[in-house]
Amino acid sequence: LLRVGTERVDAADGPRPALAALVDWHVDFALRHRALIVVQDRDWEALPQEARDRVRTLQRDYVDLWAAQLRLDDPALDLATARAMAHATFGLINSTPHSGLLPDTRMRGLLRRMALGSLGIA
């Protein structure tokens, strides 16, 4: 997520297009890798501590990638709030393994609209 997310941000023309690109990437990943999301949640404690530390570092960097764009878009946001917004958006998008009610094309559009709306950039 971090590598491609960084590429998307680097290719974007400003924070709002960067956030839209991040949303699109995360939605795409979540729809294509539902099982991975479930396994990570379920088997987290089975990972050795060193692996958990590495994953947490990558996750923090990914959150901060989003938070930086949110703060560029709205300089009044403090870092803690921007991180909380990113986490809340991830929760929305990562709910896909538990929602098989819509075909992927409709789910993609729904998640995109909801995620962008939650970030205030709809």
What are these regions, as identified by a protein language model?
Residues 2, 49-74, 83-87, 109:
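Amphipathic alpha-helical packing segments from all-alpha helical-bundle domains
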